[in-house]
């Protein structure tokens, strides 16, 4: 009897287990089939492998491979689209809407009325090298947070940026898009934006500053909020191109201390035509001149020889600042951006120098292309942020950067180019210097010798200034002025305002007379503002403090002011002519 009871109990328990297990086995089988269908759908869309492989620690990571056919993330069977602006073509509004175009350009610095007639999902021409279409990339590249900072951006331009990222990124790599609102006051960027992003079901998040912080600090906040392994920063007026993300992530997958930069295409701010900025086979990289203006130079042969293929990434000393990818944890280990930098300007150099000098590297990626709208003008000012510092904010930022990362010799080049910067209060940089010491960072001389060696080819070290300040006429007491013109342009004499800028003139020990990054030259037309000859720091000018003559040594004539016309020219030197006499007045900031 007892044996029969035990057997009956075992049979009941077995039946109960089967009742529980059978549904689980059914669900597992269906999940496996669903997973297979997802992989096949992914393979159809992107040409990628059918099964993902988890990363294994200690196992060498896959590297990109050049293949005969299309690369694994290249889109297949893309149907052509028709409509305004499709394929990146220019779009023009009808003549009766000209007033709308003009009004939106005044408000946004770009033609938002034109943008509003173009699809959020518009196609753009593939501007990549042909070779870029034939790279296979590792499937398990890091999941990415795309961070987009905006302030009073045109709604359609902002959302086209978002849609282009979603439409042209492998789904499993795009972790999230974070829109960081730097205290916008336009109504359509409040409730309308919040409602619009609901369609993305959590993929797109909006966070808002409670006061205006500026681009730099707002980006750092976005990095803090992000949860992806890699963060990609984009400006709020971009359109990413075909297969832009995998080539941007692959170098970081190989080495977490690499920062990658896409090649930037241009989008016209009036008609939204998408077009490449660079020639197809020409590669450029970011450098700088000693006033800390961003410049670009063709990639030197020394760098070209490091690569086997023309479409592979290459090293760059710096970058323009708006668009790049970096491992999130590494970015935070570097201290993110210097919190003492205000609004924008100089953050691209600060991050570049910090990365290179502290053990990382920067690579530009030819197979990653992103279009960027270059505004006609900046439609908003710095607001209350401008009152937080006395003096030009961007120059203050530059001073913080050079005082942290430059050696003494290179600091002098900056102060030679920007003499008034010596008198700016840059704030406390002790934390930045402590970070530099803690990370055991290399010297700036090392950076110039091994990474930015081509800077000297275009921008040699600057000789000291013999004289600087306002160049005043003895006869009229007016000041030499570039008049805000771009070279080539005739210079004039205007009221001395004491603020420097277009009236801040420098004469260096090699005879170069300069205003900002431009040089002062002379010909039959008069005294002209000209582009300085690259690779040179000398000039034809000589100042005699006794006679107050500024002589052109080639023409053997002196700078003169015409008494009647007030025009500037060269004349035969006459020690008794006060219209040929000049004096430099060093100025001090009125900050």
Swiss-Prot record:
Entry superkingdom: Eukaryota
Binding-site list for substrate: 182, 212, 344, 375, 380
Record note on disruption phenotype: RNAi-mediated knockdown in the whole body or respiratory system during development is lethal. RNAi-mediated knockdown in hemocytes, amnioserosa, mesoderm or digestive system and reproductive tract causes no defect.
Region Disordered, annotated ranges: 68-100
Gene Ontology cellular-component terms listed: endomembrane system; Golgi apparatus; Golgi membrane; Golgi stack
Positions bearing carbohydrate: 30, 576
Pfam families in the cross-refs: Glycos_transf_2, Ricin_B_lectin
CDD domains: beta-trefoil_Ricin_GALNT7, pp-GalNAc-T
Tissue expression remark: Expressed in developing oocytes and egg chambers. During embryonic stages 9-11, expressed in the primordium of the foregut, midgut and hindgut. Expressed in the salivary glands from embryonic stage 12 onwards. During embryonic stages 12-13, expressed in the posterior midgut and hindgut. During embryonic stages 14-15, expression continues in the hindgut. During embryonic stages 16-17, expressed in the antennomaxillary complex. In third instar larvae, ubiquitously expressed in wing, with increased expression in the notum and ventral wing pouch, eye-antennal, leg and haltere imaginal disks.
Disulphide connectivity of cysteines: 132-367, 358-441, 479-496, 519-532, 558-573
Alphabetic keyword roster: Disulfide bond, Glycoprotein, Glycosyltransferase, Golgi apparatus, Lectin, Manganese, Membrane, Metal-binding, Signal-anchor, Transferase, Transmembrane, Transmembrane helix
Membrane topology: Single-pass type II membrane protein
GO molecular function: carbohydrate binding; metal ion binding; polypeptide N-acetylgalactosaminyltransferase activity
Listed cofactors: Mn(2+)
Subcellular location: Golgi apparatus membrane
Membrane topology (Lumenal): 30-591
Residues reported to bind Mn(2+): 235, 237, 372
Pathway field: Protein modification; protein glycosylation
Bilayer-crossing regions: 12-29
Function (record text): Glycopeptide transferase involved in O-linked oligosaccharide biosynthesis, which catalyzes the transfer of an N-acetyl-D-galactosamine residue to an already glycosylated peptide. In contrast to other proteins of the family, it does not act as a peptide transferase that transfers GalNAc onto serine or threonine residue on the protein receptor, but instead requires the prior addition of a GalNAc on a peptide before adding additional GalNAc moieties. Some peptide transferase activity is however not excluded, considering that its appropriate peptide substrate may remain unidentified.
Domains (record comment): There are two conserved domains in the glycosyltransferase region: the N-terminal domain (domain A, also called GT1 motif), which is probably involved in manganese coordination and substrate binding and the C-terminal domain (domain B, also called Gal/GalNAc-T motif), which is probably involved in catalytic reaction and UDP-Gal binding. The ricin B-type lectin domain binds to GalNAc and contributes to the glycopeptide specificity.
Name of this protein: N-acetylgalactosaminyltransferase 7
């Amino acid at each position: 009897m007892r044996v029969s009871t035990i057997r009956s109990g075992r049979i009941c328990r077995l039946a109960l287990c089967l009742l529980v297990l059978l549904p689980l086995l059914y669900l597992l089988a269906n999940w496996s089939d669903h997973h297979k269908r997802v992989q096949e759908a992914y393979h159809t869309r992107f040409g990628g492998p059918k099964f993902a492989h988890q990363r294994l620690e200690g196992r060498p990571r896959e590297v990109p491979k050049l293949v005969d056919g299309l690369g694994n993330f290249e889109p297949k069977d893309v149907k052509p689209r028709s409509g305004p602006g499709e394929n990146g073509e220019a779009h023009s509004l009808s003549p009766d809407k000209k007033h709308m175009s003009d009004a939106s350009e005044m408000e946004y610095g770009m033609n938002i009325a034109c943008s509003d007639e173009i699809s959020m999902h518009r196609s753009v021409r593939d501007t990549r090298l042909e070779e870029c279409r034939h790279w296979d990339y590792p499937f398990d590249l890091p999941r990415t947070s795309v961070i987009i900072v905006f302030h009073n951006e045109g709604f359609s331009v902002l959302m086209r940026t978002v849609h282009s990222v979603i439409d042209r990124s492998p789904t499993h790599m795009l972790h999230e898009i974070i829109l960081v609102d730097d205290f916008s006051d336009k109504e359509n960027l409040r409730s309308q934006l919040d409602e619009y992003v609901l369609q993305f079901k959590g993929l797109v998040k909006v966070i808002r500053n409670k006061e205006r912080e500026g681009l730099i600090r707002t980006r750092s906040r976005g990095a803090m909020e992000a949860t992806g392994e890699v963060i990609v920063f984009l400006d709020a007026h971009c359109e990413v191109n075909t297969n832009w993300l995998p080539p941007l992530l692959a170098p970081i997958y190989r080495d977490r201390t690499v920062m990658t930069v896409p090649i930037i295409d241009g989008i016209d701010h009036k008609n939204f035509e998408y077009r490449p900025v660079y020639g197809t086979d020409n590669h450029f990289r970011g450098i700088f001149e000693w006033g800390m203006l961003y410049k670009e130079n063709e990639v030197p042969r020394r760098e070209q020889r490091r690569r086997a293929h023309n479409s592979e990434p290459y090293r760059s000393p710096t970058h323009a600042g708006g668009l790049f990818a970096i491992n999130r944890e590494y970015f935070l280990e570097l201290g993110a951006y210097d919190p003492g930098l205000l609004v924008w300007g100089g953050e691209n150099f600060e991050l570049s120098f910090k990365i290179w000098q502290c053990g990382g590297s920067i690579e530009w990626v030819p197979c990653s292309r992103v279009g960027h709208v270059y505004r006609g003008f900046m439609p908003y000012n710095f607001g209350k942020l401008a009152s937080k510092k006395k003096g030009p904010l961007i120059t203050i930022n530059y001073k913080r950067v050079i005082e942290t990362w430059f050696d003494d010799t290179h600091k002098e080049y900056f102060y030679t180019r920007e003499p008034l910067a010596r008198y700016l209060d840059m704030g406390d940089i002790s934390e930045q210097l402590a970070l530099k010491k803690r990370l055991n960072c290399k010297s700036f001389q090392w950076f110039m010798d091994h990474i930015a060696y081509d800077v000297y080819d275009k921008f040699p070290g600057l000789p000291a200034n013999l004289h600087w300040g306002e160049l005043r006429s003895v006869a009229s007491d007016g000041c030499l002025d570039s008049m805000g013109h771009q070279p080539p342009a005739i210079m004039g004499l205007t009221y001395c305002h004491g603020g420097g800028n277009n009236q801040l003139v420098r004469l260096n020990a090699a005879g170069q007379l300069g205003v900002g990054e431009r040089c002062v030259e002379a010909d039959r037309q008069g005294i002209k503002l000209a582009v300085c000859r690259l690779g040179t720091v000398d000039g034809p000018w000589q100042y005699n403090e006794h006679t107050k003559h500024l002589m052109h040594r080639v023409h053997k004539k002196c700078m003169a002011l015409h008494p009647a016309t007030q025009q500037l020219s060269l004349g035969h030197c006459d020690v008794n002519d006060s219209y040929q006499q000049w004096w430099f007045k060093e100025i001090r900031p009125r900050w």
